[in-house]
A protein has these predicted regions:
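Catalytic cores of the polymerase beta-like nucleotidyltransferase superfamily
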Residues: 2-369
Length: 369
């Protein structure tokens, strides 16, 4: 419904878990100076999906100069971390808060945008990519939804803000961002008009740097619904533009690490060169290819990566380590089979992982003494 010319979603979100005392104080400081501060972007989307946001971004109708004056007046430390973009970082209770002035695009070239500072929340929302990324929320949980983002989340569909072709041609990387976010939805619905716009402008990705392509594709490949998302990347012609071979969808399975996912593809080595993998990523890919026909080794590598092992340990000559403790070792130390033994084995395995898989059998057994 529209209240005071602002579209507010009919139900409040539960914002309490992320609203700290520092955020409440910052909000009051802006209000006391006749300005507004809201949570914007991905944090609002994640809360609406019942997820805990990793990062919280804030926006305000105050200009950077006004922000700094407001924070100075309140005795709050701050740093001009991105003045050209209108971003000030306020530091309160030893916690940084990035606050950005509302902006509107004045000029775009398919890769970057020139912006100007504005006072309109709706104008700022217009420059964002997808409807559910264009929402903002106050600390009470009121959602300001100008383009139907909440409805799209409920319908499990991703749509561009306003005209899809305009949003895409402003920054062609938005095509891959679309697929990345679509993959995050549970059993997503595909919007035909959006797919037509992507198909029409897929070639625009040829002007995007390899690093930016991989940055987005790595998130696509480590997300959910990878097979269905890649299938649609192929159907829209995007795969040909970015170098992804076709007919991969049926072979792809969801993986926690993008290199693990990419290793399933026939042209993974060529893609690694084209997308300019880091040295660590290249070493990991070569290792995975070397052990491709050994499912046991593959599983161990996946466990290692999932547990955060330093990728430097995984190189072309590496041997995948075996957990050195068995139930027989614990029985030999006098432990009886049962739940306690299982718990001890799990505890020792966690210690072994914490050592980057270097702790010896004796060291681990001594830890049980």
């Amino acid at each position: 419904m529209r209240i005071d010319e602002v579209l507010i979603y009919e139900e409040r979100l539960n914002a309490k878990p992320i609203i700290s005392a520092a955020i409440i104080k910052l909000d009051k400081v802006f209000k006391d100076n006749n300005h507004e501060m809201r949570i914007v972007g991905g944090a609002v989307r994640d809360i609406a999906l019942g997820k805990s946001p990793k990062d919280i971004d804030f926006a305000t109708d105050a200009t950077p100069d006004e922000m700094m004056a407001i924070l100075d007046k309140a005795g709050i430390r701050h740093k001009p971390t991105g003045l050209e973009h209108g971003t000030i970082t306020a530091i309160l209770d030893n916690e940084p808060f990035e606050i950005t002035t509302l902006r509107a695009d004045t000029e775009t070239d398919g890769r970057h945008a020139e912006v100007e500072f504005v006072k309109s929340w709706e104008e700022d929302a217009k420059r964002r990519d997808l409807t559910y990324n264009a929402m903002s929320m106050d600390i009470e949980g009121n959602v300001y939804d100008y383009f139907g983002g909440m409805d799209d989340l409920q319908d499990k569909v991703s749509k561009f803000v306003g005209d899809a072709e305009e949003r895409i041609t402003e920054d062609y990387l938005r095509i891959l961002r679309y697929f990345r976010f679509q993959g995050r939805l549970s059993k997503p619905t595909w919007d035909n008009d959006t797919l037509e716009a992507i198909t029409k402008h897929a070639k625009g990705l040829s002007g995007i740097s390899a690093e930016r392509i991989w940055q987005e594709m790595s998130k696509v490949l480590s997300g959910q619904n990878v097979a269905s998302v890649v299938s649609m990347i192929e159907k829209t012609g995007v795969s040909k533009v970015i170098g992804l071979s076709t007919n991969n969808a049926n072979t792809l399975k969801d993986k926690s690490n993008p290199v693990l996912a990419l290793a399933q593809l026939d042209n993974s080595v060529d893609l690694a060169k084209r997308w300019k993998f880091s040295n660590n990523e290249t070493q990991l890919l070569n290792f995975l290819i070397k052990h491709k026909n050994n499912p046991l080794d593959q599983k161990k590598v996946e466990d290692m990566i999932a547990d955060g092992v330093d990728k430097d340990l995984v190189n072309t000559d590496a041997q995948v380590p075996d957990f050195p403790i068995t139930g027989a070792d614990l029985i030999a130390k006098g432990m009886k089979p049962g739940p306690e033994m299982g718990a001890t084995l799990n505890k020792l395995k966690q210690q072994w992982k914490a050592s980057n898989f270097t702790a010896t059998k004796d060291e681990l057994l001594n830890a049980t003494s």
